[in-house]
Each structure stands twice: as C-alpha cells, then as structure tokens.
C-alpha cells in the first residue's frame, strides 16, 4: 500500500494530470502485476482471468514507447500470437493494464477512508453477502411496502465515460479510454448498440466493471443526497457493488450535489422510514408509509435515469408490492414479511378479554423452481427435477466425481442455510446425490441399484446430508436439542463474498 502512495505522490508532484503518464511507467505495471496476484482484503476481482505475465507486460511497455504504438494495422491480425502479436490480444493486455492503473488512486482513497472511520478490522465481515440479511431482518419487519428496482444498463459506453469525467480531469487519459471503446466497436461492427455493452462486459470485464461501478455510484450519490435532505434521520443503507466489493462505501466521496438544484424536488419526499439495499444491478427500497410515496420515488428514479444519465427505463422495471402479501426475490432468496397471529386471554376481575397479537417476522425461503432450473441448465436434472447423470464427468475417477458433487452441495448448503425452511434445500441435496450415483453408475456401465449393491457407496454418499451437521457440531454443543434448533433457525455466514452460478439465477 505504501509503495502505491509513494509512486503516486511522485507523479502527482510532476503534473496535475497524472493518470495518463502512469500508464507508460514500467514500475507501475510491475506494481499492478504484484497488486493483482497479492490481493488485500479490500479487493475482489471476481470473474477476472489474468492471462498476462510480468515478461509480457515488460515487452508491452517497450512497444508502447515506440512510435505509433497504438496504431495496429489490419495485417497484424493474421500474425502468429507466439511469433508476433495478435491485435485482439494486444488490445486486451493494454485494456487490463489500463484498468488496473485507473483503480489504484480509488483504491487508496477507499483504504484511507476506512482507516479514518476505524472499521478496517470489521470490514472483512461487512463484505459478506450474508451480512445483508441480518440488516433486512432488523429493519424490514417494521415496513409495509417494498419496491423491487432493477438498475438499467446504459445503452452506450460513452455514457459511462461521461460520468467518469466528473472525477478525472485528464484529457489524454480519456483519449486513450475512447480508443479502447472505438477499437472494440470497430472490431465488433456487426453487433448492435443494444448488445455492444453486454459484449464489452464479457471481453473487457475489469474495465467495464470499473466504469459501471462509477455509474451506479453516481446514481446512488444523488439518491443518498435527496434522502438525507428530506429527513432529519440518518439514512439506513447497505450496498455491495456489482461483482466488485472493492468499491464498498465509495459513495461517501462522490460528486457533491447542491440543494438549490433540487429545491422543488425535496418537497415530494418526506419519509423518515425508508431503507435501501443493493447488490449488483438490483436494489430494494422499502418504506412504512403509503404506496403514494413509493410511486413518487419510482417516477423519480425513472426521470433520473432518463434525464441525467440518458438511460431509458420502463416503469415496469420497478415493482411496488405490500410486504405482507408479496415476496421479493433478492440474492437468491424469496423473502416476505409473515404475520404470526396469536390470541391471549386476559381476565380483569370478572371480565375476560381475548387479545389478538400480531408479530411480524421476515420469512426467507429457498426458491426451489429457479434452483431446479439452474440445475437443469447445468445438466444435473431435467426441468421437472428428475436427476440425470453428468456424462461429461464420467472420465474422471470415482473420488473426483464424488468430490465435485460434494463441493457443489457444500456450497449450496453453505449459502442457503439462512433459509427459514430447509425442506427445499434437502430436495436440492437429494437431486445432487442421485445425480452423483447415476454418474458413477454410467461410468461403470451399470444400473444404479447394481452399482450401489456392488460398491457399497451408499454410506459414503450420506455425506450429502451429514457434512453440514458435523461442521455445526464443532461450533455448537453436540446435543440433539441444539442441532434441532439449528435446523429450524437461520444461520448466516460472514465468509461468502459472492454467489456462484447456481445461486445467481436471477
């Protein structure tokens, strides 16, 4: 961390626009390489596949110093990537290095803000996805209405660049950034503008996630300002940024918005009981007051996206429902507020009264149908939930096959242990268990019954149901009453940093 600060201070002292010169400094690429392979607790590069080595980076820098280093002729695209260089691969390496360099100053800004707030030690737990659900349990039981919001994607990459211009005042830096986008659009000239941003996010995940995070931060900073101005109470918010928890809490240091720009708007929002939660591109807004106010927030979001960010959004992308009657889908769970009614008899002198007590409780359930759909997509079962053999794994050893299935089952059980009802989770485990048995039987060219009778693997496959109990017994007292209570209650883990493909089925 101190090395980054030293190098940044050195270049900042030379000139104000320091980001562009950083890109052409060899020591920065060495730091970026080290930074990527020795990640601190603040950095999550989910889905990023680093295919470069330090030797490739050094050769790249040598070419970048040469004249016309960014001009690549069309004939170069046919070169052997081992003898010469491939145009697409060359651009990919520059794009990845460019994104790493851009992240450095914002990473320093984040770490310094966390140190000032003295929350560095507890930051590891705050990063967990499951830490959102205790927040929902504490706050949402007192609320009545929930708004399910899906943040729209910009239809053009230039919108993301324009948002970044509020923070970075470096013309050369933006020329190079637009070069990447222009090179991408020319390389994919047959792709429509609507699909271009989706394709860019897959081919340049690191750079796209950085730009997208800035877009979401800008939108949330304005929302946060309006919320704080419309109430004297402190905003209760919790957000985990899109695939990169790297940007957690950066909304504290975003563009300052002045009250005079929203003087007429603030009169519409007077809601002291409002809570906001977001993960990736989906957010939840909950309120205690009437749905009229929720509709005002809905139209505010639509106009904000259309007028300020030039992003078209249909009113149908925001759904407003009553918590006691509808469930909302968030982070792989179905959640709603359940009303538990009980009648208490009270007697005063000779008069007897029946008092009805209503207790609200947040009910969090495993969504069985989307999970079966995800398992069917991965070829573990059909769309009806009947287990299938994973024939593509039949070439592996028996131990590897069982270990793969156990790992999937362990991850799902680990993630969905916060469910109020474990019945659906046990059904998913049962599907994976039978799929594992069918895969082993397929490998040995036998039927399921004959394979189990011959190998006696039935006891081994009981790990699908008993492994979680063994882990919990190491943490809690090993008594039947304790284990039964753990099966009924929710268990949230603070070491889950992102959801896997089977969970992320939204």
Swiss-Prot record:
Lineage top rank: taxon: Eukaryota
Family the entry assigns: Belongs to the intron maturase 2 family. MatK subfamily.
This protein's UniProt keywords: Chloroplast, mRNA processing, Plastid, RNA-binding, tRNA processing
A GO term, aspect molecular function: RNA binding
Tagged with keyword Plastid: yes
Subcellular location: Plastid, Chloroplast
Source species of the chain: Wisteria frutescens
Gene Ontology, cellular component aspect: chloroplast
Presence of keyword Chloroplast: yes
PANTHER family: MATURASE K (PTHR34811:SF1)
Entry function: Usually encoded in the trnK tRNA gene intron. Probably assists in splicing its own and other chloroplast group II introns.
InterPro entries recorded: Domain_X, Maturase_MatK, Maturase_MatK_N
Name of the protein in its database record: Maturase K
GO terms classed as biological process: mRNA processing; RNA splicing; tRNA processing
């Amino acid at each position: 961390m101190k090395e980054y600060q030293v190098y940044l201070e050195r270049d900042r002292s030379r000139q104000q626009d320091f980001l562009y010169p950083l890109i052409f400094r060899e020591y920065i690429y060495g730091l970026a390489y080290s930074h990527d392979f020795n990640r601190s607790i603040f950095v999550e590069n989910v889905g990023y596949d680093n295919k470069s080595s330090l030797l490739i980076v050094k050769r790249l820098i040598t070419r970048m110093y040469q004249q016309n280093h960014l001009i690549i002729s069309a004939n170069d695209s046919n070169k052997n990537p081992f003898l010469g260089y491939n145009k697409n691969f060359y651009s990919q390496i520059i794009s990845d290095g460019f994104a790493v360099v851009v992240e450095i100053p914002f990473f320093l800004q984040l770490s310094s803000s966390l140190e000032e707030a003295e929350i560095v030690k507890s930051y590891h737990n705050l990063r967990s996805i499951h830490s959102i659900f205790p927040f929902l349990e504490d706050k949402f039981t007192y609320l009545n209405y929930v708004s399910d919001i899906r943040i729209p994607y910009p239809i053009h990459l230039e919108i993301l660049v324009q948002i970044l211009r509020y923070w970075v005042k470096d013309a050369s830096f933006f020329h190079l950034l637009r070069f990447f986008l222009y090179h991408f659009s020319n390389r994919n000239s047959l792709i429509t503008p609507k699909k271009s941003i989706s394709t860019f996010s897959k081919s340049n995940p690191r750079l796209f996630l950085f730009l997208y995070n800035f877009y979401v931060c800008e939108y949330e900073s304005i929302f946060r300002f309006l919320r704080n101005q419309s109430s004297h109470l402190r905003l209760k918010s919790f957000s985990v940024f899109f695939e990169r928890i790297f940007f957690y809490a950066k909304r504290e240091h975003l563009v300052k918005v002045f009250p005079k720009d929203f003087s007429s708007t603030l009169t519409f929002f007077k809601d002291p009981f409002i809570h906001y939660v977001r993960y990736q591109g989906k957010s939840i807004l909950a309120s205690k007051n009437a749905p009229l106010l929720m509709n005002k927030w809905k139209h505010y979001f639509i106009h904000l996206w259309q007028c300020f960010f030039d992003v078209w959004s249909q009113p149908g992308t925001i759904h407003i429902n009553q918590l006691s009657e509808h469930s909302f889908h968030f982070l792989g769970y179905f959640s709603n507020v359940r009303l538990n009614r009980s009648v208490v008899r009270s007697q005063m002198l000779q008069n007897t009264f029946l008092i009805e007590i209503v207790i609200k409780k947040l009910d969090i359930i495993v969504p069985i149908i989307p999970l079966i759909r995800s398992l069917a997509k991965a070829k573990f079962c059909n769309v009806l939930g009947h287990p299938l053999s994973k024939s593509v794994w039949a070439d592996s050893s028996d131990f590897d096959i069982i270990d793969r299935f156990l790992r999937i089952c362990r991850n799902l059980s680990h993630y969905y242990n916060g469910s109020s009802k474990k019945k659906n989770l046990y059904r998913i485990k049962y599907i994976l268990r039978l799929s594992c048995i069918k895969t082993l039987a397929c490998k040995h060219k036998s039927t399921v019954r004959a394979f189990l009778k011959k190998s006696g693997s039935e006891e081994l496959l009981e790990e699908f149901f008993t492994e979680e109990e063994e882990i919990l017994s190491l943490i809690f007292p090993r008594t039947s009453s304790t284990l039964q209570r753990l099966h009924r209650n929710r268990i949230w883990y603070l070491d889950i940093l992102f959801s896997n493909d089977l969970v992320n089925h939204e």
